[in-house]
């Protein structure tokens, strides 16, 4: 499904929060949305590997990487795993790498920047925890919609029909 965050903001202005414009699209899918699963991890993507093995149909992985752009939390291997398990998209408050490969995937990926350095994979972090960045507080179960214009958040799914 294609999402237009500008239109959604016009229709649901009282129901959505607009995330500050921190992100660039790195995935092959320019718009995406779904129910979020939150993760907090700093320069370590081991927990992301575990979560992306789950069925991601209708889901978006929201990663609070502490805003670090020193180490990439998402790479081509994790992107392919997300596609294999039908995730709608990934939003990273941090960095990605192997961007030429990521843009070929049928997956929405928004992140702050790209860097060639990879993250550790020790599995350090927390999932399904409250995270806050971009002027918005995110909870697992909230609904996120993203396109090239921006990222918005709603407590409930928006009626898009």
Curated annotation (Swiss-Prot):
Q: Which UniProt keywords apply?
A: Cytoplasm
Show the GO cellular component annotation of the record.
cytosol
GO terms assigned for molecular function: endoribonuclease inhibitor activity; enzyme binding
User: Could you mention a single GO BP entry for this protein?
Assistant: negative regulation of RNA catabolic process
* Compartments, as annotated in UniProt: Cytoplasm
Pfam families, alphabetically? RraA-like
What assembly does the database describe for this protein?
A: Homotrimer. Binds to both RNA-binding sites in the C-terminal region of Rne and to RhlB.
- Check the record and name the NCBIfam families matching this protein: NOT-MenG, PRK09372.1, RraA_entero
Question: What protein family is recorded?
Answer: Belongs to the RraA family.
Per its database record, what is this protein's job? Globally modulates RNA abundance by binding to RNase E (Rne) and regulating its endonucleolytic activity. Can modulate Rne action in a substrate-dependent manner by altering the composition of the degradosome. Modulates RNA-binding and helicase activities of the degradosome.
Question: What is the protein name for this chain?
Answer: Regulator of ribonuclease activity A
């Amino acid at each position: 499904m294609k999402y237009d965050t500008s239109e959604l903001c016009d229709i649901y202005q009282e129901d959505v929060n607009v995330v500050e414009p921190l992100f660039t699209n790195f995935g092959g899918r320019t718009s995406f949305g779904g129910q979020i699963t939150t993760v907090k991890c700093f320069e370590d993507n081991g927990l992301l590997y575990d979560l992306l093995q789950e069925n991601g149909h209708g889901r978006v992985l929201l990663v609070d990487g502490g805003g670090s752009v020193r180490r990439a939390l998402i790479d081509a291997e994790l992107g392919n795993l997300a596609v294999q398990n039908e995730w709608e998209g990934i939003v990273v408050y941090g960095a990605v790498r192997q961007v030429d490969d990521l843009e070929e995937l049928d997956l929405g990926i928004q992140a702050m920047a790209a860097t060639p350095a990879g993250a550790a994979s020790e599995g350090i972090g927390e999932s399904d925890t409250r995270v806050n960045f971009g002027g918005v507080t995110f909870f697992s179960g909230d609904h996120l919609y993203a396109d090239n214009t921006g990222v918005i958040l709603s407590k409930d799914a928006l009626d898009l029909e």
